[in-house]
A protein has these predicted regions:
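Transmembrane beta-barrel strands of outer-membrane/channel proteins
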Residues: 57, 86-90, 119-123, 150-154, ...
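Repeated loop/turn-to-beta-strand initiation elements of outer-membrane beta-barrel proteins
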Residues: 81-86, 113-117, 144-148, 173-178, ...
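Outer-membrane beta-barrel initiation region
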Residues: 23-95, 101, 108-109, 248
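Detector for outer-membrane/organellar transmembrane beta-barrel domains
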Residues: 130-192
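Outer-membrane beta-barrel "beta-signal"
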Residues: 207-212, 242-256
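Membrane-embedded beta-strands of outer-membrane beta-barrel proteins
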Residues: 73, 105, 136, 164-166, ...
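Residues that define the transmembrane beta-barrel architecture of outer-membrane proteins
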Residues: 49-51, 67-71, 99-103, 130-134, ...
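Residue-level signature of outer-membrane beta-barrel architecture
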Residues: 77-79, 109, 140, 154, ...
Length: 256
């Protein structure tokens, strides 16, 4: 009985010591009161949900004979770390057809301060045969703050594709920006229904001079080059279309 009493007394003493230590534990940092205020400091709100959208290219293109319309935009909703992206781009040609219509739905995860990894689906939806792809890629700011993105794609029957894009904003003044832009597409197999050949299929590049009326809206002018190569060029020639063109462009860029 004496041993049981001693054990009980020891347990009670340990519980008392633990309770006292808990009562004297330091206040968590996010509950500390700044000197001279009556409000607690709030933790960093890195889990707030934001919405962002940008129409990077909304432009007419012309070589003096055949005007085309080009769009390229994207938007996302999410936190600093996790986002859902929608991207869309394409051409409406002077004959009323739509081509190069690519629409992507991606989950985005930040992996470093400047780069995100993205995965999801791409749908080629325009006047030609519809194709659907699985997508995996990256997007971010490279050294010297070039905006770059590269994506690999895969679909049925062993078809693979890749796309790389890069652009940069040179601030000539606070409101006048010169933007070079480059995009290249590659495919592992030919797809005649979409006038796509294996290898490097097309390059779209341009130089645009933008005047920002404010940071969210700016009209621009410039020059753009579209080129089809290799087997893609052969397929395009068969239907009587041009394999390359240099065009004057004019449009607007806006974001929210």
């Amino acid at each position: 009985m004496t041993r049981l009493g001693t054990l009980f007394t020891t347990i009670c003493a340990l519980v008392s010591i633990a309770s006292a230590a808990s009562a004297q534990a330091p206040t968590p940092p996010d509950q500390l009161l700044p000197a001279g205020t009556g409000e607690a400091v709030q933790p960093v709100m890195d889990r707030m949900i934001f919405v962002h959208g940008i129409l990077d290219q909304f432009e007419g293109r012309t070589d003096g004979r055949t005007p085309d319309f080009r769009w390229s935009g994207e938007g996302w909703i999410g936190t600093d770390y996790d986002k859902f992206w929608v991207k869309t781009e394409g051409f409406r040609r002077s004959n009323g057809t739509v081509d190069d219509g690519q629409h992507e739905f991606l989950y985005d995860r930040a992996i470093t301060t400047y780069f995100d990894v993205q995965a999801g689906l791409r749908s080629d939806l325009d006047s030609r045969r519809t194709r659907n792809w699985a997508a995996l890629g990256f997007e971010g700011l490279a050294p010297l703050f070039w905006h770059v993105q590269g994506t690999g794609y895969a679909r049925d029957s062993g078809h693979f594709a890749a796309r790389f894009e890069a652009s940069y904003d040179f601030l000539l003044t606070n409101t006048l920006i010169l933007q070079p832009q480059f995009e290249v597409n590659l495919y592992s197999k030919s797809d005649p229904a979409r006038l796509i050949g294996a290898g490097i299929s097309e390059i779209d590049t341009g130089l645009r001079l933008r005047y920002e009326l404010d940071r969210k809206f700016g009209p621009y002018i410039g020059v753009a080059y579209e080129g089809k190569f290799g087997q893609t060029a052969s397929l395009v020639r068969r239907v009587g279309e041009s394999t390359s063109a240099v065009r004057f462009v004019f449009g607007i860029r806006t974001w929210f």
